[in-house]
Swiss-Prot record:
PROSITE patterns: D_2_HYDROXYACID_DH_3. SUPFAM superfamilies: Formate/glycerate dehydrogenase catalytic domain-like, NAD(P)-binding Rossmann-fold domains. The gene is ghrB. Its EC number is 1.1.1.79, 1.1.1.81. One of its GO terms (molecular function) is glyoxylate reductase (NADPH) activity. This is Glyoxylate/hydroxypyruvate reductase B. It catalyses: glycolate + NADP(+) = glyoxylate + NADPH + H(+); (R)-glycerate + NAD(+) = 3-hydroxypyruvate + NADH + H(+); (R)-glycerate + NADP(+) = 3-hydroxypyruvate + NADPH + H(+). Catalyzes the NADPH-dependent reduction of glyoxylate and hydroxypyruvate into glycolate and glycerate, respectively. It is an enzyme of class 1 (oxidoreductase). The keyword Hydrolase does not apply. Homodimer. The keyword NADP applies. Pfam families: 2-Hacid_dh, 2-Hacid_dh_C. It comes from Pectobacterium atrosepticum (strain SCRI 1043 / ATCC BAA-672) (Erwinia carotovora subsp. atroseptica).
């Protein structure tokens, strides 16, 4: 008899067929849907979004594996999963290059004021030669500081070093030999990173240690010409402090793909600022990469429920 699983995000037809080959699949339009009878027999879940916590696990007593179509897993209570022995799988490898491309897009858009200038053109303000009030700042040869040198940080460093001849600084728990050898990256403490970076690129996940890691005190240590880029998690940055810094000119601009509350409320003060480029958390949102993420998540669930896990496991201790 096939294991029962819950699918809570639509996937391509071929991927759905693969799930059907291995499992008895119940597809939910809403999740977590605690009152749905499929939870009682589900051994696996696959999708993205929705909270998986102790309450959910009480309604899914047979759950053995959860496969999220994402790198981030902050919607999962990992401690609760560990207590129940539930394997949590994610997709950390397939979106690296696409998210790194998004970082460069945010850097260029913020530095060259692309969104602001486009809106001015559409509003009919381009009536002749452009003056300095239309100017942006260069990206090439500027110093990039990367906060968190994981897969995405390394891919950003590659683009910055080879594509824009940028000196690379980084702050991480340990030295990254590949970054230092290939891109001449320099490991430094956080204060040095803040003080010397023209672009501060945040790639960190959200943890107790990284929550509001960048606040008013840290922003004050940055250059007035600096641009902050965040594609990690919104709450790594204190949004109130960031808004204040952007209004006061403590830093020049920000390019943001992640926010504390998503979708970003329409009354967020960040949306009123011309020096903010705000994206709707689309760092990995290309047709190719989203397909690859879903395919990886399907493979992950099959591996987890067949006892064949070799990679992409968030909590490998439950495998022992």
């Amino acid at each position: 008899m096939k294991p029962s699983v819950i699918l809570y995000k639509k996937v391509a037809d071929d991927l759905r067929a693969r799930l059907d080959q291995h499992f008895t699949v119940t597809e939910l339009d809403a999740f977590p849907a605690l009152d749905h009878p499929a939870l009682a027999t589900a051994e696996g879940i696959i999708g993205s979004g929705g909270k998986v916590d102790k309450d959910f696990l009480q309604h899914a007593p047979r759950l053995r594996a959860a496969s999220t179509i994402s790198v981030g897993y902050d919607t999962f209570n990992v401690d609760a999963l560990n207590e129940k022995g539930v394997i949590l799988m994610h997709t950390p490898t397939v979106l690296t290059e696409t998210v790194a491309d998004t970082v460069l897009a945010l850097m260029l858009a913020s530095a060259r004021r692309v969104v602001e200038v486009v809106e001015r053109v559409k509003a009919g303000e381009w009536k002749g030669g452009v003056g300095s009030d239309w100017f942006g700042t260069d990206v090439h040869h500027k110093t990039i500081g990367i906060l968190g040198m994981g897969r995405i940080g390394l891919a950003v460093a590659q683009r910055a070093h080879f594509g824009f001849s940028m000196p690379v600084l980084y702050n991480a728990r340990r030295h990254h030999a590949e970054a230092e050898e290939r891109f001449n990256a320099r490991h430094c403490d956080l204060d040095t990173l803040l003080a010397e970076s023209d672009f501060l690129c945040i790639t960190l996940p959200l943890t107790a240690e990284t929550h509001h890691l960048i606040g008013r005190e840290q922003l004050a240590k940055m250059k007035p010409s600096a641009i902050l880029i965040n594609i990690g998690r919104g709450a790594v940055v204190d949004e109130d402090a960031l808004t204040e810094a952007l209004v006061k000119g403590t830093i020049q601009a920000a390019g943001l793909d992640v926010f504390v509350k998503e979708p970003l409320p329409v009354d967020s003060p960040l949306l009123d600022l011309p020096n903010v480029v705000a994206l709707p958390h689309i760092g990995s949102a290309t047709h190719e990469t989203r397909y690859d993420m879903a395919a990886c998540a399907v493979d992950n669930l099959i591996a987890a429920l067949s006892g064949q896990v070799k990679e992409n496991c968030v909590n490998p201790q439950v495998l022992k």
